[in-house]
Amino acid sequence: MKQFLMAMVAMTFVPAMALSQDKTDQMKITVHAGDTALSATLDDTAAAQDFASMLPLTLTLEDYHGIEKVADLGRKLDASDNPDSYAPKAGDITQYAPWKNIAIFVAPFQASRGLVRLGEFDGDFSTLSRSGPIEVRIERAD
């Protein structure tokens, strides 16, 4: 009976340990826009890891229909473990695979086939909402 109780207690901690492990697997990045540094977290997916392998990157983000800022990445990321479509929310960092671009959503949008979530901003990202092109440098956080 004592062994059974000890096993039950141990099993209650396994999910909590798994959750804390998931958080440490997520990579923190910094998006620099002028003098502003924006914190973001990449998901623990093949696509996000593939994107992280390209860092640091300097990109010019362009407006796209007032909903997102986009820039060409030059290649598709490994989306083997992602769903076929995704409905983004404001602050999501994604790749639209058919066009091989990064898309940072400044407003929510409907589910789109080929949209792959990479991560999200940790807080205010309104610097990226301004009109016109914005040069950014994306790098792993220290």
Regions found by a protein language model. Give the residues of each.
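Boundary at the C-terminal end of the N-terminal hydrophobic targeting segment
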Residues: 18-20
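Well-ordered alpha/beta subsegment
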Residues: 25, 119-142
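Short, surface-exposed secondary-structure edge patches
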Residues: 83-87
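Loop/turn positions that initiate beta-strands
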Residues: 90-92
